[in-house]
Amino acid sequence: MCDMYSDFILGSSSKCRSQLLEVLGFFPKRSIGPEIDESPKKGELPLTYAKRMAYEKALKLKRVCHEENVITADTVASCGRRILPKACCDEDVRYCLEFLSGRRHRLYTSLCLVTKSGEVRQRTVMTVLKFKRLSNEEIEFYLATKEGIGKAGGYSIQGMAQGFVLFIRGSYFNVVGLPAYEVISLLRSVGVFQQSREALYSQGVKDAK
């Protein structure tokens, strides 16, 4: 009976996504970051790319977790038709911030759930943001924080970059990387329900350390 609270595998190595799930009351059996080729196809639109990444991650994870519900997420930053990189170095972060300075952009997070029986369920959320004009000093200071490394669009909304944002239209949690309403809806659709960490610990489902 207790398995209904943790009956899924999270296809992500992101500590932030794991923490957000726990805040929402979901505790995956395991978290595994599936490795796939994340190169955009020629002419691929940002929305299509986000959906494809989440789907391919879920399929790869399902191959090794055959009898489990698996859920994956992929966040993509874009400006117009341009897909911005997931920053892997300071130069990527600088490129993204210089490009986004004074501009409106979009963040897509696509969620993909593959059920135990192999059924695919997918939801995608879009949020629009606008950055203020950034000075060279602000960009250099942000580079020194290293917050943008590994982030779509080269920034983390939970850190110093929140001071760059003039407005957000849409889900804030989508910008963080895990839209809450859609996650809850998908997991509940396969019988995975929310529970507190304390209740899980008292039932012996999960180590509360």
Curated annotation (Swiss-Prot):
Localization, UniProt: Cytoplasm
MF-aspect GO terms: nucleoside triphosphate diphosphatase activity
Cofactor: a divalent metal cation
Family: Belongs to the Maf family.
CDD domains given in the database record: Maf
Keyword entries, A-Z: Cytoplasm, Hydrolase, Nucleotide metabolism
PANTHER family noted in UniProt: BIFUNCTIONAL DTTP/UTP PYROPHOSPHATASE/METHYLTRANSFERASE PROTEIN-RELATED (PTHR43213), BIFUNCTIONAL DTTP_UTP PYROPHOSPHATASE_METHYLTRANSFERASE PROTEIN-RELATED (PTHR43213:SF5)
Disulfide bond annotation, renumbered to this chain: none
Taxonomic classification: Bacteria, Pseudomonadati, Pseudomonadota, Alphaproteobacteria, Rickettsiales
Main function: Nucleoside triphosphate pyrophosphatase. May have a dual role in cell division arrest and in preventing the incorporation of modified nucleotides into cellular nucleic acids.
GO BP: nucleotide metabolic process
Organism encoding this protein: Neorickettsia sennetsu (strain ATCC VR-367 / Miyayama)
UniProt protein name: Nucleoside triphosphate pyrophosphatase
Organism domain of life: Bacteria
Any one cellular-component term (Gene Ontology): cytoplasm
